[in-house]
Amino acid sequence: FNRYNKENQEVSKIAEKQLFDYRQKNPGSCFANTEFSLDVNTAYILQDKITKLRLNDGEKIIGYKVGCTGSGTKQQFGIDGPIRGTLFDTEQLKNGTSLSLENFCRLSIEGEMAIKIDTDGGIHSVFPVIELHNFIFRGAQKTLSELIGNNGINAGIILPQKEFFNSRTYLNKRANLYININNNNVGNAELWPLPGGPVASLNWLKKNLNQYNLKLLPGHIVLAGTAAGLYPVKKGDRIEVYIN
């Protein structure tokens, strides 16, 4: 019991430091320490402790992300997911929002599909989003633990126009998702990164949440991951994500 208590206190301390760093736009500094390492389970416990701190500060969970699923990000990171991250109300932005680079650390974006959860825990609708990231790994080698402990390097999401929120058009229809930066196509991929489509991402997430006594609620948004990559953005860039 004492050992567990001590470990629990240590993870709580790391959680406070992680949240402080994140808010200072200097995320994950503890991973720069070569002596520092976490296993995947402890990384999720850390993520959930940071979430509790954010909830105590008045933020709300609006859903989760399933990350590191597609060939693009797997290749970029050199690691195999999936992993789970947590989404917050303070970081959901409207279509057409202007961002300030100073509010991020190496801002990069993904275009991907999101799932809105129905009252029965199934899929209410699906629509494209832009996911924002602080694209930084500090460990000598990229690890799933660092990715999870930094909340899947998520830094927010940009939602589409309201008319998409109830759309089921692309639930079973095949199409591609395109990412444009300054009217140049930088990447495109099939809508869903896992062979089983949106249901596969959702089932994996439900299983993961269940392991940590968490669950999806009606209205939650789930980012299903992307088969494309992560794209760095510069000052003045205009980003568009669309389905064709």
Predicted feature locations:
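Catalytic-core "active-site belt" of small-molecule-metabolizing enzymes
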Residues: 4-197, 202, 211, 238
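Short basic/hydrophobic patches in alpha-helices and adjacent helix-turn junctions
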Residues: 204-214, 221
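Short, charged beta-turn/beta-strand-edge "cap" motif at the junction between a beta-strand
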Residues: 227-231
